[in-house]
Amino acid sequence: MTDLQSLESDLLAQVQGAPDEAALEGVRVAALGKKGAVSELLKTLGAMSPEERKERGPLINGLRDRVHGAILARRETLAEAALEARLAAERIDVTLPVREGPETRGRVHPITQVIDEITAIFGDMGFSIAEGPDIETDELNFTALNFPEGHPAREMHDTFFLPPGRDGTRKLLRTHTSPVQVRTMRAQEPPIRVICPGRTYRHDSDQTHTPMFHQVEGLVIDRSANLAHLKWILEEFCKAFFEVESVKMRFRPSFFPFTEPSAEVDIQCSRQGGEIRFGEGNDWLEILGCGMVHPNVLRHCGLDPDQVQGFAWGLGIDRIAMLKYGMPDLRPFFEADMRWLDHYGFRPLDIPSLVGGLTG
């Protein structure tokens, strides 16, 4: 065996025996580095005669190429082995329980949950949902709803007015969702049965009031709609929402420009130890306002009060959420405190409350 064959066998054995990338790099430097065995042989070519160089040159260059090729092949083999080892170490057992993710840590805001509950209950009664813009015209927010000029609700201390539009139309942030009822009556033919949830705005802020709050109003327009129908709907809603089998309600005469007659509704409750319970006790708590739609409102919407009639009601979503779930202060609803939301919020898959169902 010649010296070149012996050197090649030795170097190839070292390459194949390298256990990792670091050892393989050491073999490469020892063979092909500046002072490596093969590199030193290449340096001797310059001192040889042309005949010797012609004979030895191809042999030494061939040795260099074969050693270099063996190193590349070994490096690829080691990389594949390292990848397989890493994949084995990072193997995921799909049978293990998953880690708690955002969908379990996150919470649904109580307002969102209560809106879902309200729509589920009224949806079971056959109501549709109607929506409208937060920015309304003075005509839709007041005039069409029988608010005369000079009414206190038109004053700056109650309403957020905006700069007039290009056509001079007076704009404002709606003070109730009643404009949605006007839009609905103008767009649809009776019979109409809708609820109108949404944000409303009034210039007020304390423990039970915020400048922006949520309201839901209901509207029924038909030839024979009457107060008995209104009373049944409100009773069924209160039983289903507060999850009680029965509840007493008290209708007190009141005044709203858009209804005649008008009433405020109190619900039976008990107050013990700072806790309010509905469907029992001898106390009363006001929860909403209602009444028969005023003939002037029907006329503003293009309806003939001699042919159709209807009733409407409205209640504060934030307030009934506080009552049902025992929240003492309204302001944290809008402060984005994750601790509060984690305590009072709902899991994403919690089903909207319709426990009692409807009795009729």
From Swiss-Prot:
GO terms for molecular function: ATP binding; magnesium ion binding; phenylalanine-tRNA ligase activity; tRNA binding. Binds 2 magnesium ions per tetramer. Keywords: Aminoacyl-tRNA synthetase, ATP-binding, Cytoplasm, Ligase, Magnesium, Metal-binding, Nucleotide-binding, Protein biosynthesis. Its main location: cytoplasm. It is found in: Cytoplasm. It comes from the Bacteria. GO terms for cellular component: cytoplasm. GO terms for biological process: phenylalanyl-tRNA aminoacylation. It is an enzyme of class 6 (ligase). CDD domains: PheRS_alpha_core (cd00496). Its EC number is 6.1.1.20. Mg(2+) binds at residue 260. Its cofactor is Mg(2+). It catalyses: tRNA(Phe) + L-phenylalanine + ATP = L-phenylalanyl-tRNA(Phe) + AMP + diphosphate + H(+). Transmembrane segments: none annotated. Belongs to the class-II aminoacyl-tRNA synthetase family. Phe-tRNA synthetase alpha subunit type 1 subfamily. This is Phenylalanine--tRNA ligase alpha subunit.
